[in-house]
């Protein structure tokens, strides 16, 4: 299915007023099928997060916010104290779905904190939904700012290598890393994207290439293992990725990002990270963050096809950690930060 304009694509995640439910693009079906699914219960939303129907740090922040709004809508509590208990249970369930992405918990906590201003149960429901909607709206504005600050790093005619998907489908709309590309193109620059497949779930080949092709942005798909050779051949002008969590010492992002950072450093190619301030974990460091481990069968199988012996031992972390010394700059909605990266400066 090819869409003819941006208006054909709904936001990655939104609220359906008529059914009081969360609606989202099921990214597990791409590129074969573009389908919007409805989450009418908290358990269905949690399943959507766990199974990566919705993924990407900023999108998960919105999912966390809408999740609390959904729980408030479904709660049968008669008083604020009972509702608060219900929402704390919902918050725990939402946060447990993905351990590494900081935005999910940030979105949950932001809506919970907003509800503290409520005077009654209906007021809490109204505040929760409005705060969740604010998170979604702010995400789009934030991504546009990231794009604005990042375009100076992309020259007319550049080829940009990216990993996983940090585009509109990783956010409510527009994108972080790919948002920088979109902003540069809006300025009239010709930019090409080299998308790494991003094994084992192939977010690069399934989602990034599909998304860019919808917007008619030139994209070339390569195997993950070819990135270094592409750099050696002079095909890559810069590497531009998103982030799932940024701590004092490292950038957590999709597995394979660390390898790209080493290859970029070896070939003297700039390595940029594009992420909102909400992705920063100001108190964390590499050793304090639990990296999510995925199902071993993601490596043993591709769909229904077996790729490896069923009983082979598998090590399948979802993320890796790129040290700050490998990062040229971090592009945020508050501006660009350069090494040495002092997170206290980000708070100013």
Swiss-Prot record:
Keyword flag Transferase: no
UniProt-recorded name of the protein: Putative methylthioribose-1-phosphate isomerase
Keyword Amino-acid biosynthesis part of the UniProt annotation: yes
Function statement: Catalyzes the interconversion of methylthioribose-1-phosphate (MTR-1-P) into methylthioribulose-1-phosphate (MTRu-1-P).
Protein family per UniProt: Belongs to the eIF-2B alpha/beta/delta subunits family. MtnA subfamily.
Species annotation: Methanosarcina acetivorans (strain ATCC 35395 / DSM 2834 / JCM 12185 / C2A)
EC number, UniProt record: 5.3.1.23
Upper lineage: Archaea, Methanobacteriati, Methanobacteriota, Stenosarchaea group, Methanomicrobia
SUPFAM superfamilies to which the protein is assigned, alphabetical: NagB/RpiA/CoA transferase-like
Reactions accelerated catalytically: 5-(methylsulfanyl)-alpha-D-ribose 1-phosphate = 5-(methylsulfanyl)-D-ribulose 1-phosphate
């Amino acid at each position: 299915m090819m869409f003819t304009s941006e208006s054909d694509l709904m936001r990655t995640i939104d609220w359906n007023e008529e059914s009081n439910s969360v609606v989202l693009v099921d990214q597990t079906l791409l590129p074969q099928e573009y389908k919007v699914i409805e989450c009418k219960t908290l358990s269905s939303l949690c399943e959507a997060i766990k199974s990566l129907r919705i993924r990407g740090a900023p999108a998960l922040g919105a999912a966390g916010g809408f999740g609390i709004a959904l729980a408030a809508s479904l709660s049968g509590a008669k008083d604020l104290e009972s509702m608060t208990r219900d929402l704390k249970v919902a918050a725990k369930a939402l946060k447990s779905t993905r351990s590494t992405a900081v935005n999910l918990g940030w979105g949950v906590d932001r809506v919970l904190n907003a509800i503290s201003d409520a005077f009654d149960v209906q007021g809490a429901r109204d505040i929760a939904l409005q705060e969740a909607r604010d998170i979604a709206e702010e995400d789009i504005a934030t991504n546009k700012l990231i794009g604005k600050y990042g375009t100076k790093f992309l020259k007319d005619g550049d080829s940009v290598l990216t990993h996983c998907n940090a585009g509109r489908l990783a956010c409510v709309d527009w994108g972080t890393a790919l948002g920088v590309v979109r902003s540069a193109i809006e300025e009239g620059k010709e930019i090409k994207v080299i998308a790494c497949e991003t094994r084992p779930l192939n977010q690069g080949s399934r989602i990034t290439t599909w998304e860019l092709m919808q917007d008619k942005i030139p994209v070339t798909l390569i195997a993950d293992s070819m990135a270094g050779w592409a750099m050696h051949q002079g095909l890559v002008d810069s590497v531009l990725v998103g982030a799932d969590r940024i701590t004092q010492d490292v950038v957590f992002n999709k597995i394979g990002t660390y390898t790209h950072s080493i290859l970029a450093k070896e070939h003297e190619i700039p390595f940029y990270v594009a992420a909102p301030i909400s992705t920063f974990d100001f108190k964390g460091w590499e050793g304090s963050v639990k990296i999510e481990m995925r199902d071993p069968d993601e490596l043993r199988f591709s769909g229904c096809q077996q790729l490896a012996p069923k009983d082979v031992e598998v090590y399948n972390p979802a993320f890796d950690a790129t040290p700050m010394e490998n990062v040229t700059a971090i592009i945020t909605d508050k501006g660009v930060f350069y090494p040495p990266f002092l997170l206290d400066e980000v708070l100013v």
